[in-house]
Structure formats: C-alpha cells, structure tokens
C-alpha cells in the first residue's frame, strides 16, 4: 500500500432536466473546467477531514468507537469507506485533504466530485484504483447519505466528464457538442441549501398535483430531447429558448426563488440566449448561455446580485489520478 494518493473530479452544470431526472425524465449535463482534488494520506488515528471550505472534522474508523458522534460532514465519506471495505479494501487510519475550485452547496456537483475523488484516491493508495463502474457505485453510497435520493447524474458526470444525456436506469450517452461562439456564465446566488430538502419539496408538490404533474414531466422530457438535438446541431438560439422553458417548468414545481429569478432576468436582460437555475434550486447557481462577445456584459449584470460569477468551459476529462 502506498502512503498517499491524489485524485480529482470535475464540477458540473445541468443544462436541462434537474429534478425531473429523479422520476425518469432525460437530463443533459456537462462537466465544467473547475475541479475538486482529494489527497488521501495513511496514518494517524481514525479518519480526519481537512478542507478550507468544510473545516476540520475527525471520527473513529467504522466499527471502532461506535458511541462517538460523527459530524454530518464526515458521514458521506464514511459511507464511501464502508463500500470500499465491502469490496475488499482494508480500512486504515487516514487523512482526507480536500482542495476545491467548485463552490460548495451551489448546485455545481461539489459533493459528487468529492465522493468520486475520495473513492478513487483511497483505492489508488491501496494499489488498485477503482474501475469507472465501481467508482460510480461506491461514490453513490456517499451521495445517498448527503442527498437522500440522488438521481446519479452528478456522480456520472464526475466520473466520465464531457457532455452526457442521462436517464436514470439507462447507460449515459455521450453528446458531441456542435456549439461554437457561445459560452456559459455561472452566477452563484450565495444562498446555501440542502439538496435533499429541495428534492423532497419538489416531489411533494408533484405528488400533490397528481395527474397534472405527469404533463409537466412529459414536457420536461421532451424539451430535454430537443436540447440534445440543439447541442449536437450547434443551434444556440434554440438551446437558449429551451433553457428558458426549462426554468418555467422548474419554477412550477417550487424549485426557484427570488434570488434565482433575479439573476435569471438580469442575464436575459443583458443578452443571454437563455438562463435558468442549475442543480437543486432555492439558491445555488444560475447559468446563462451567451454569445462570446456579450458575456462580459452578462458578468457586469450579475455583480450586484451574486456572490461570485465566472465563465465555464466544458471539461472533456472526468475523474483522474494526479501526481504530487
């Protein structure tokens, strides 16, 4: 066994399909060029997590010190560790160092990227890096603790990278984007929320609507398929219209907020072809599709209403091992 290993995974934006993907609709998701890195070092006592964003947390190894209270921040990592142990990896004391270029709790997949990078680095430390299929399965155990009923789309894109068409229970399909001359603007509302709370709220509204909600879900699935075709054909104008329609559907099920709508309309007023929330909603981030020559105006438009904003490129590479 090596003394240490390091791995990274990309963040993501959901172009269309968040929430609806939980119940079988299509989602289009893209990895972005911001990554989260995890370094695992053996030694010490128990498990220690060190992160500039999440702080420092420690806990006994699974099966030791069962009476000790474990920080909720560490619980997903422990779930991943248990899954690794079930696959034959030895459980040893170690430190987890997290370095992230992905804002946490912002809908950009930081949690999934962390679970993926941790699972890959821990398995690599043992000299046997997980396959992509096993990496997905192990990381999902952590996401279940973090989010309750994750669709799996965040973990899939963190493992694979690129742009994917994702439907729960089916193999993801790689999309070859034909878009040129456009870029995504990402603006963070600065409002943190628990994904699990928003997912449960949206599902409760859908259930309360009964049969009417089936039409909303059908519409979401249809526009996701239209988005796929627009991306492949390079039809940015149509993709923007689809993003706007997707925002309306998400709002109808209670996923939006005043902070989100403010950023959406500021982007649209600044020339965005389309703008919508990405991720769970209730806060987190908004994405806008801009022509390259107009994105600076978009950035200026959201300065006062966001905690941070940046342009995002598509990351073709998913999870990877890294040298020290």
UniProtKB/Swiss-Prot annotation:
GO process annotations (BP): isopentenyl diphosphate biosynthetic process, mevalonate pathway
GO molecular function: ATP binding; magnesium ion binding; mevalonate kinase activity
Active-site residues from the entry: 154 (proton acceptor)
Keyword Transmembrane: no
Cofactor: Mg(2+)
Protein family per UniProt: Belongs to the GHMP kinase family. Mevalonate kinase subfamily.
Name of the protein in its database record: Mevalonate kinase
SUPFAM superfamilies the record matches: GHMP Kinase, C-terminal domain, Ribosomal protein S5 domain 2-like
Gene expressing this chain: mvk
Catalytic activity: (R)-mevalonate + ATP = (R)-5-phosphomevalonate + ADP + H(+)
UniProt: ATP binding residues: 103-113
Domain of life of the native organism: Archaea
Compartment(s): Cytoplasm
Annotated organism of origin: Aeropyrum pernix (strain ATCC 700893 / DSM 11879 / JCM 9820 / NBRC 100138 / K1)
Record EC number: 2.7.1.36
GO cellular component terms, A-Z: cytosol
Complex formation: Homodimer.
């Amino acid at each position: 066994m090596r003394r240490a290993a390091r791995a990274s995974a990309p963040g993501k934006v959901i172009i269309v399909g968040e929430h609806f993907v939980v119940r079988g609709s299509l989602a289009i998701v893209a990895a972005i060029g911001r990554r989260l890195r995890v370094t695992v070092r053996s030694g010490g006592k128990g498990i220690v997590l060190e992160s500039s964003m999440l702080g420092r947390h420690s806990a006994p190894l699974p099966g030791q010190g069962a009476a000790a209270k474990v920080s909720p921040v560490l619980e997903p990592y422990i779930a991943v560790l248990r899954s690794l142990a079930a696959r034959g990896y030895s459980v040893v004391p170690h430190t987890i160092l997290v370095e992230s270029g992905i804002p946490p709790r912002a809908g950009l997949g930081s949690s999934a990227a962390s679970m993926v990078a941790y699972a890959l680095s821990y398995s690599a430390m043992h000299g046997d890096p997980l396959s992509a299929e096993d990496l997905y399965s192990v990381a999902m155990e952590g996401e279940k603790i973090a989010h309750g009923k994750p669709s799996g789309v965040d973990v899939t894109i963190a493992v694979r990278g690129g742009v994917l068409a994702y439907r729960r229970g089916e193999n993801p399909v790689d999309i070859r984007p034909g878009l040129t001359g456009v870029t995504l603007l990402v603006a963070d509302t600065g409002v943190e929320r628990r994904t699990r709370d928003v997912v449960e709220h949206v599902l409760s509204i859908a259930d309360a609507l009964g049969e009417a909600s089936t039409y909303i879900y059908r519409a979401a699935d249809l526009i996701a398929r239209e988005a796929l075709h627009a991306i492949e054909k390079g039809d940015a104008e149509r993709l923007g219209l689809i993003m706007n329609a997707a925002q309306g559907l998400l709002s109808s099920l209670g996923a939006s907020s005043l902070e989100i709508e403010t950023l959406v309309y500021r982007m649209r007023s600044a020339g965005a072809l389309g703008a919508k929330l990405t991720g769970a909603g209730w806060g987190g981030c908004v994405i806008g599709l801009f022509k390259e020559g107009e994105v600076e105006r978009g950035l200026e438009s959201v300065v006062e209403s966001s905690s941070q904003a940046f342009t995002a490129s598509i990351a073709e590479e998913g999870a990877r091992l890294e040298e020290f």
